[in-house]
From Swiss-Prot:
Top-level taxon of origin: Bacteria
Protein name: Small ribosomal subunit protein uS7
PROSITE patterns, per database record: RIBOSOMAL_S7 (PS00052)
One GO cellular component term noted in the UniProt record for this chain: small ribosomal subunit
Length: 156
C-alpha cells in the first residue's frame, strides 16, 4: 500500500466553446484513435443540432439527458464462501456521470442514423426526453439492483 495516500483527481479543463467540463468529458468519450479534432467536430455538431431542434441551450439539454441516464444504484459482484452474489451498492456522483457518458456514447454508436453527429444528437435528445437505449440501460441497472436487494447486507 502506498504511504502517500491516493493520488488527487485531475481537474479536466473546460471546453473552449461552451466552457463546461461535461462537454470536455463527452469529447474524450467520443474520441477514437487520438483524433481529438474529429471528436470535437462531432460533439459540437451534435450540440448545435440539439440547439436547432429544441431552441434551448444545448449544454442544458445535455445535462438533462445525463440526469436521465445517471444510475443511483448498481450491482457489484461479491464472493462469499463458494457463491458469488450481485450486491446492490450506491453509485458515487463521479462514477454516475462517467457511466452516463459511457452509455450515451455506446448506444450512440449502435444507432442507425447516417453520421455520428446525427446519432449523438438523436441520442442526447432521446435521453433528455426520457427515451432511448441509454435510459433503458439505467432502468435495467436499477431493476437488477432491486432484484438483488436481499444481498444488500453483504455491502462493503
Amino acid at each position: 500500500m502506498p504511504r502517500k495516500g491516493p493520488a488527487p483527481a485531475r481537474q479536466l479543463p473546460k471546453d473552449p466553446v461552451y466552457g463546461d467540463t461535461i462537454v470536455s468529458q463527452l469529447i474524450n468519450k467520443v474520441l477514437v484513435d487520438g483524433k481529438k479534432s474529429t471528436a470535437e467536430r462531432i460533439v459540437y455538431g451534435a450540440l448545435e443540432s440539439c440547439r436547432e431542434k429544441t431552441g434551448t441551450d444545448p449544454v442544458l439539454t445535455l445535462k438533462k439527458a445525463l440526469d436521465n441516464v445517471k444510475p443511483t444504484l448498481e450491482v457489484r459482484s461479491r464472493r462469499v464462501g463458494g457463491a458469488t452474489y450481485q450486491v446492490p451498492v450506491e453509485v458515487r456522483p463521479g462514477r454516475a456521470t462517467t457511466l452516463a457518458l459511457r452509455w450515451l456514447v455506446m448506444f450512440t454508436r449502435q444507432r442507425r442514423e447516417n453520421t455520428m453527429t446525427e446519432r449523438l444528437a438523436a441520442e442526447i435528445l432521446d435521453a433528455s426526453n426520457g427515451l432511448g437505449a441509454s435510459v433503458k440501460r439505467r432502468e435495467d441497472t436499477h431493476k437488477m439492483a432491486e432484484a438483488n436487494r436481499a444481498f444488500a447486507h453483504y455491502r462493503w
